[in-house]
């Protein structure tokens, strides 16, 4: 692990960014869901709110959907800041099951009824988050595209940002009214972004950034610092992406995570993981390359939901194998999943 040295200019710039775009008022309420040990949570669920004179409510337990719903209902926060996993869990457990019944699928095909249902679902979701917020800001990891499509179809007020500890943390953001679906926004104030690619709009390259938010370097580690920040001050994020002509950045994966297929094809495990996460009873998953260069998926199933439905461990194994077959039907031959391994507990974070 490396210690990140953040100067006061980075803390100031991140806080100033929040004052410029989040516009909370003295006395507004925010629920702190994220750990204070992470810059994302520290910067945007404490430092900014403290400076703005807001009330910060700290969760004292692990943020399960039930606990979060209770907190939203009681506090009614003015803005919601979270990581994708929490939002996805809430939607998968409380929204998708209601939309995926046969009756609901049939009703959604009728135009006028479709609009009424979506309006009701949107209102239900807004109330689930307290009914008093301007937008939900999602960041810290890739956001599931199926969940995002649902939110967009409902005109739900959400946006996806991008950052890292080395930038204290913000790199990209866009207000939900101007946000481009699938992206993570545009360069934040006082930050620049470029893609290390001959064609940044179409050919994936490493995302580079520089500006007031960027760290001084890694604590007592000049070698790692020199590898991360080049002579022109560009921080090499290690993330791969593209950027359109309007400056919207879309992340494709991590350069360190990228795998090579049998004939040299680029495989981005995050894209496969996203497909797997949409399958039945999948809570978390990681795609790895085995010693024989074939791909395997490590899956932590949603045991709570499975057992509630009366399923046995053997049933779960069968369903996961069916999931493997289903995801392979959507993948090219060089990125097929050949094996599933079930994990008994959540992955370490």
Per-region residue spans from a language model:
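Conserved adenylation A10 loop of the ANL superfamily
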Residues: 1-3
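Conserved AMP-binding/adenylation subdomain of ANL enzymes
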Residues: 8, 12-29, 36-124
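Gly/Ser/Thr-rich phosphate-binding loop
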Residues: 78-81, 91-179, 283-284
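Residue-level signal for inorganic ion chemistry
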Residues: 80-83, 193, 247, 276, ...
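Conserved ATP-binding/catalytic segment of the ANL
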Residues: 187, 194, 201-261, 289
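C-terminal boundary motif of the adenylate-forming
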Residues: 196, 240, 245, 279-303
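Adenylate-forming
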Residues: 214, 248-277, 304-315, 333-337
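Conserved C-terminal "lid"/linker of ANL adenylate-forming enzymes
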Residues: 284, 293, 325-349
């Amino acid at each position: 692990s490396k210690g990140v040295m953040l100067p006061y200019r980075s803390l100031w710039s991140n806080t100033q960014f929040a004052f410029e775009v989040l516009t909370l008022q003295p006395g507004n309420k925010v629920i702190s869901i994220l750990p204070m040990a992470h810059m994302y949570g520290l910067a945007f669920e404490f430092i900014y709110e403290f400076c703005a004179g807001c009330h910060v409510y700290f969760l004292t337990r692990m943020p399960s959907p039930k606990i979060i719903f209770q907190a939203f209902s009681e506090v009614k926060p003015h803005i919601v800041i979270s990581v994708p996993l929490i939002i996805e869990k809430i939607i998968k457990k409380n929204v998708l099951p209601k939309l995926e019944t046969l009756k609901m699928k049939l009703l959604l095909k009728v135009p006028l009824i479709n609009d009424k249902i979506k309006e009701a679902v949107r209102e239900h979701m807004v109330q689930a988050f307290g009914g008093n917020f301007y937008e939900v800001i999602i960041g810290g990891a890739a956001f599931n595209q199926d969940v995002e499509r649902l939110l967009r179809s409902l005109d739900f007020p959400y946006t996806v940002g991008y950052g890292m500890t080395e930038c204290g943390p913000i790199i990209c953001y866009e207000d939900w009214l101007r946000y481009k679906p699938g992206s993570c926004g545009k360069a934040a104030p006082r930050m620049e972004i470029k893609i290390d690619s001959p064609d940044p709009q179409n050919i994936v390259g490493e995302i580079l950034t520089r500006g007031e938010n960027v760290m001084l370097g890694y604590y007592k580690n000049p070698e790692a610092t020199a590898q991360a920040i080049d002579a022109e001050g560009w921080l090499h994020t290690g993330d791969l992406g593209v950027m359109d002509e309007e400056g919207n950045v879309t992340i494709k994966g991590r350069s360190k995570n990228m795998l090579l297929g049998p004939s040299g094809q680029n495989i981005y495990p995050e894209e496969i993981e996203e497909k797997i996460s949409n399958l039945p009873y999948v809570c978390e998953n990681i795609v790895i390359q085995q010693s024989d260069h074939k791909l395997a998926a490590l899956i932590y199933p949603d045991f709570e939901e499975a057992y509630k439905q009366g399923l046995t461990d053997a049933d779960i194994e069968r369903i996961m194998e069916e999931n493997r077959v289903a995801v392979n039907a959507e993948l090219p031959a060089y990125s097929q999943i050949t094996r599933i391994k079930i994990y008994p507990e959540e992955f370490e974070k």
